[in-house]
């Protein structure tokens, strides 16, 4: 089992390793030292009784209320209670784990003032496999979902552990862990920041990387089985419009289809291909750029201090608590909205290619790739499913961060809505994988419609992997199991690994 050690720069791959693949988490000596150093300042501030938001005062519009030192532990617990109000179906376990990992990254920055023992409990919960039950709706960018994680930490709420859903206290007990008694400022720390936005957006970015490369793979296969031409992928065309991601996409397609016997057999069959094939570099390229832009934003966000207030050492040896708004989620939210647009565009082109594969008027193949038309429908309905998914993606492409409502007695008269953006980005990736799965299934069936099935080395590898889950279809059969199986192969990066083993590394 891999271990991710925190203390340096954390990456999206680190987050996915922990959240999705169960890697363990450890703290470096540097991580522990900076946490303890900052906590000492918070303890001193608490004893001195200075007016510091969330430490000696209430939250939101209650910032005007001073909290006596004797009541601060009670207030921290009450803060968790009050903010635990998300609703609806629970988020996926990998999303909860991603949130907990982000907490460790953000709160361990050395500027929040959280205690090391509180962070250690989050780490130990991750390593033990305790996953708080977190409802998925009702966040403007922070606070409510995070409250449900805090509830389990204090021995309340609900969590899953070893396949069972348990009371939070019982889950901790079975794992040999004890609840934490929150100290000054810690309730606020656990609730504040861009935890959920960063978590969902990071998972979405990882999947968007996977999908954008898989689109190159599926699109290449489609080009080949539709007797296309590589002319539009020529390096000279790319060189005079030198967007790096356009250049890389064309290079991927050329590599996958290198020395294709099928393309050679049909050389000159068409003057040029339809736009959904000819224009892959010009659409897949911008999608990759959008993913890279989001990745750059989230790489910063994952390694940021996002609480309010934040604690800083001063050059003269003093210490200051600065009230600000690093907890705002617009950076990650706007990046997520852009991801939704990008992945919808990617799938728009995939859907056009699916139509060309199934439409005998343009494919020069049997209608709906149906090899036994007397009693069968072929793959007609796979296009309906894909079109429905595209409709959902278009809805999710509407930006979330442009929305606003005033909250908290006008003290928080603007809210970022970053969580809604990040959640729909995560959901969009889930939908998009099925559209690419549909294209790959159609590709495989199209190849089977030829008597001479000799194809490029890259596409042969794709076909062979596809056939481990999806049989050649001579008669109608339920398609859902095959869509699910291929979609899982896609998200597992099986097609990327298989193609790279055959033709070399793809460019992203």
Residue ranges, per PLM feature:
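C-terminal auxiliary extensions adjacent to catalytic cores
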Residues: 2-23, 27-34, 38-41, 45-46, ...
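FAD-binding core of FAD-dependent oxidoreductases
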Residues: 53-75, 82-107, 133-156, 164, ...
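Generic internal hydrophobic packing segments that stabilize the cores of diverse globular domains
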Residues: 39, 76, 96, 115-123
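Conserved SET/PR-domain catalytic core that frames the SAM/AdoMet-binding pocket
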Residues: 49-51
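FAD-binding glycine-rich core of flavoenzymes that anchor FAD
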Residues: 110-139
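Short secondary-structure transition/capping motifs
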Residues: 27, 31, 64, 68, ...
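Short alpha-helical scaffolding segments that buttress acidic/His motifs in well-ordered protein cores
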Residues: 15, 79, 83, 95, ...
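A broadly tuned "polar low-complexity/structure-edge" signature
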Residues: 97, 124-128, 465
């Amino acid at each position: 089992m891999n271990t991710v050690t925190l203390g340096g720069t954390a990456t999206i791959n680190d987050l996915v390793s922990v959240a999705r693949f169960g890697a363990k988490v450890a703290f470096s000596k540097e991580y522990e030292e900076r946490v303890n150093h900052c906590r000492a300042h918070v303890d001193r501030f608490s004893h001195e009784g200075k007016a510091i938001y969330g430490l000696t005062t209430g939250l939101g519009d209650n910032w005007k209320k001073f909290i006596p030192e004797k009541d601060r532990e009670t207030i921290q617990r009450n803060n968790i209670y009050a903010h635990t109000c998300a609703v609806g179906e629970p988020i996926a376990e990998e999303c909860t784990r991603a949130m907990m990992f982000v907490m460790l990254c953000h709160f361990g920055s050395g500027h929040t003032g959280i205690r090391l023992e509180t962070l250690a409990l989050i780490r130990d919960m991750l390593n033990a496999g305790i996953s708080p039950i977190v409802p998925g709706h009702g966040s403007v960018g922070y606070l409510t979902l995070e409250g449900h994680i805090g509830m389990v930490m204090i021995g309340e709420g609900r969590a899953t552990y070893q396949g069972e859903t348990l009371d939070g206290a019982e889950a901790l007990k079975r794992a040999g862990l004890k609840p934490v008694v929150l100290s000054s400022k810690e309730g606020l720390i656990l609730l504040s920041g861009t935890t959920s936005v960063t978590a969902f957006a990071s998972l979405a970015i990882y999947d968007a990387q996977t999908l954008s490369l898989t689109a190159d793979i599926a699109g290449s296969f489609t080009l080949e089985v539709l007797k296309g031409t590589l002319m539009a992928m020529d390096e000279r065309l790319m060189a005079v419009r030198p967007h790096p991601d356009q250049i890389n996409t064309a290079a991927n397609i050329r590599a996958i289809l290198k020395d294709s016997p099928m393309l050679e057999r049909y050389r000159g069959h068409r003057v040029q291909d339809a736009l959904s094939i000819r224009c892959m570099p010009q659409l897949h390229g911008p999608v990759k750029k959008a993913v890279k832009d989001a990745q750059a934003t989230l790489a910063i966000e994952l390694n940021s201090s996002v609480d309010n207030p934040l604690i800083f050492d001063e050059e003269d040896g003093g210490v200051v608590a600065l009230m600000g708004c690093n907890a705002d989620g617009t950076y990650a939210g706007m990046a997520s909205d852009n991801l939704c647009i990008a992945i919808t565009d990617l799938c728009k082109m995939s859907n056009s290619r699916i139509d060309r594969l199934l439409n005998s008027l343009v494919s020069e193949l049997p209608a709906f790739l149906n090899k036994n038309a007397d009693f069968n429908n072929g793959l007609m309905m796979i296009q309906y499913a894909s079109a429905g998914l595209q409709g959902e993606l278009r809805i999710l492409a509407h930006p979330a961060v442009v929305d606003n409502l005033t909250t908290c007695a006008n003290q928080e008269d603007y809210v970022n809505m970053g969580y809604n953006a990040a959640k729909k980005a995560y959901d969009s990736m889930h939908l998009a994988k099925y559209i690419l799965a549909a294209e790959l299934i159609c590709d495989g069936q199209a190849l089977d419609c030829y008597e001479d099935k000799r194809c490029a080395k890259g596409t042969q590898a794709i076909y062979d992997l596809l056939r481990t889950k999806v049989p050649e279809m001579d008669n109608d059969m339920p398609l859902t199991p095959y869509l699910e199986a291929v979609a899982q192969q896609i998200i597992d990066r099986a097609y990327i690994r298989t193609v790279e083993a055959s033709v070399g590394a793809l460019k992203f």
